[in-house]
Amino acid sequence: HIMPLLAAVEESEEIKGLLILLNTVGGDVEAGLGIAELIAGMKKPTVSLVLGGGHSIGVPLAVAASKSFIAPSAAMTIHPVRLNGVVIGVPQTYNYFARIQERIVSFVTGHSNVSQEMYTKLMMQTDEIANDVGSVIYGEEAVDCGLIDSIGTLSDALDYLHERMN
């Protein structure tokens, strides 16, 4: 029920900004993109801080804020869209996944400084994760490639937010 809460934050005259603390292994793509779109569309100042992990759909959530920070020890996993279980209609499912992946890549590259080429390269890497495709990047790497704005702590994120709220 986070979406109605984000709408309430945006409408509230008492709330001047939003701090998003992320520590997630990922989850539902549709829900994550919906939440990320809400955050990205807010007029109030927003700041995200990745702590521990901002994996999978946590990446769009992290870059949705107007400013993103990552702890030096935090990690982010970038990978293609996945599915477990029985697949009926393989070509159709593949096409559907390709379209979902395009939405994610477009959102991430549109709300960060990482290029589409770099993000796709990280997503399709085959020598990073055992028996899988993708990359795990850590604090400084996420900043160096343009995915996250800055290395930072809770104090850094709050300082940024307070500056924007005044």
Question: What kind of region is each of these model predictions?
Answer:
Residues 1-59, 63-79, 83-166:
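N-terminal organellar transit peptides
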